[in-house]
Structure formats: structure tokens, C-alpha cells
Amino acid sequence: MDITRTELMDRVHALVPAFAERAQKTEENRAPLDETITDLIDSGILATLTPKEYGGLELGLDVAADIVRTISAVCPSTGWVTSFYIGAAWRVNIFTEQAQREVFADKPYTLTAGTAAPLGQVQKVDGGYRITGQTAWNSGSVHAEWFTFAGVVFEEGSAPTPLWFLVPREDVKVLDTWYIAGMSGTGSNDISVDDVFVPEYRTGPFALALAGTAPGQLIHPNPMYHLPFLPFAMAEVTPVVVGALRGAADAFVQRTKDRQGTISQEKASGKQAAQMRLGRALAAADAAETLLDAFFERLTAQRPEQSDPRDRAEMKLKAAYLADLARNALNDMVRGIGGDGYRNSAPIQRYFRDLSVLSVHAFLDIDTASETIGRFTLDLPVSDPLL
């Protein structure tokens, strides 16, 4: 596959009107529509980060961010699932080369869902492991072909070993649990496994992945694949936040132009308060985009300190700050949308709910991220399993 960044972005922009039109149906469906997944596959978007060795595009993380930000501006749920499906091609490289080749055997993309939350039971057996448990927040589960699970192996005389497990869809059960106020269209259902056998080659050393040094990562010469897990995960979620904020600001502009008082019949656009609130919204969207660009510049700079937990914590805080900025901006906007702005058909209320949920995601929680940096700064113990 050989597509330039410009060609790929042209394809993305061509899909945006359809994704915007489907936004409300996506929310009602609680997952992306089948035709949306088909569009993502046929356009080549999902091969953005797949190594060229497996037929992918192997474009930069900044390209993936542009794609996700653009889609999220019209439908944050679609942008979120797109980001995780694109990112799955990177995360698969945490596993062995044999597992990678299995996943990409017949196509240059992978529909993979999963979380980093540990399973309840992992047992070492001949040739692999048996896993049992249930995990939540599996975005993209409805269309996923593979699932990833984290777990800790306890063997007598050895330190606990955190591993990642790769499991085909036929070995898991997707539970219909995704009923939530925001990001409703992501299909982030619970997933369960019951005494499922996972061969050794479908496991990855999660502790090494946290530092970007899993053997499966290192077989690829492109340094993009050598990033630590957490900063990469931040690179998946932050473009959704920034795109959603831009979409909200655009929706607020339109809402301000259209809104008319019920009693006075005065147009909202003629009020100084509305004009000031609109200015703040646009400034916040611009600031978020600038901060996102700086985040990716730092992420891709190939700095030696990237393997240091403090540096990873700083990247997490930068991402959380972006989410906090977006939520505060939305809180300000919705004070000026009137009652009609909360109708189900009004895009602005969907952005408000989506960003409210995004901002409390485990990776984007400002309180936790701030506390961690505070503890590092004060030379206090830090216990974050993802650092």
C-alpha cells in the first residue's frame, strides 16, 4: 500500500460529511454503524500506523492525530474508535513477531479492542496460559476481531510478571453493557473470557512495553514503534479531545447565530455576553490545538529521557491538562446555549456530554495526573502501574 499523507487526508475529509450525518445514529446505536467501519477500512485510514513490512502505510503519529482530530470534530465517538483501531496496529507490535504476522496475514489493519486493566485469573500451563475474567471499557468491541487483556503471572520463587494477552474474537464473550451519558457511540462493552488458552507466542511483556523495549517493538527499525506504552496511549486519546472541542466551538458559533429569545425575540448574537463567550470558546479551541502540536513534537523527538517514569508522568499530565481545558471551555459554552441547545438533535449537547466523559477517563483525569507530578516533584513515592 502506498498512499501519501495528502492523499490520505483527502480521503478523510471526503468521509467527514457522512460521519457528521451519522453522529446521532451512532450514539443511538451505541457503536459505530457498519457502514462507518466499511468506510474506514476501504479508505485505508486504519493502515496509517501499520508497519510497511505488513502492507501498511507506516506514516507518522502526527498523521494519525490529524485523522482522528478531523473525524472527532464531527463525531467524537467515531473519532475515538478510529483512533483505537489505528493505534491497534502499533499496540500489536508489543507481541511476538509470530503474533504480528498472524494478525496482519490477510490485511494491513487490525480491528482490535482491549484495555490495560488486569484480569482476575492467569494460570501458567504447558505452551502458554489460561485466562479467566472480565474487563470493562473495551472501545470498538462491537466490530473487533481481536481483543487484548492484561494480567499478572505469579510463579513460586519469581517476581510477579505483568503480561499482555492477544485473543481472537471467537474465544471471548462481548457483554452488552455500554449504557452511558457520553461517548455513547464507542461500543466500549465489557468483555469476558472463561478459562481461555492463550499460546505463549500471543503474549507480550507489558513491563517492557511500558518502557518501549518489548522485543516485538524492537524488530521494527522505525523509532515510532519504540515509544513507551503510556505516552503512545496519550497520543491516541488527546486528538479526540482536541477535535471534539473544535467541533463544539463550531457548533456553538452556529447555535449563537441561530438562537433567539423565547420572550424578547432578541437574537443571542446581538448580546455582548454571547459574543464574549464565543470569543473564549474559539480561543480555547485554538489553544488546545497549539498544545496538541507541542505534545506531539515532544512525543516524537526521540528523547533519551522518554524511558524515565517522571517523563511519562509529565506527558500524561499534559494530556490531562488538555482534557481539563476542553471540559472547562464546554462548561462555559453551554451556559449560553438555551434550552433548545439541550435537545437530542442539537450537536452542542452531545459534545458537552462526550467531553464530560472523556475528561474523567483514567488516562485523562487531571487530579490523578497532577498529584503524580506533585509527588515526583516533592520526592515522594509514586505508585502508578502504567508508568
From Swiss-Prot:
Keyword Oxidoreductase: yes
GO terms assigned for molecular function: acyl-CoA dehydrogenase activity; flavin adenine dinucleotide binding; pigment binding
Pfam families according to UniProt: Acyl-CoA_dh_2 (PF08028), Acyl-CoA_dh_N (PF02771)
Keyword annotations of the record: Oxidoreductase, Pigment
Keyword Iron: no
EC code(s) of this entry: 1.-.-.-
SUPFAM superfamilies linked to this entry: Acyl-CoA dehydrogenase C-terminal domain-like, Acyl-CoA dehydrogenase NM domain-like
Function (record text): Gives rise to a blue or pink color to bacterial colonies. May have hydroxylase activity, resulting in the observed pigment production.
PANTHER family on file: ACYL-COA DEHYDROGENASE, ISOVALERYL-COA DEHYDROGENASE, MITOCHONDRIAL-RELATED
Name recorded for this polypeptide: Pigment production hydroxylase
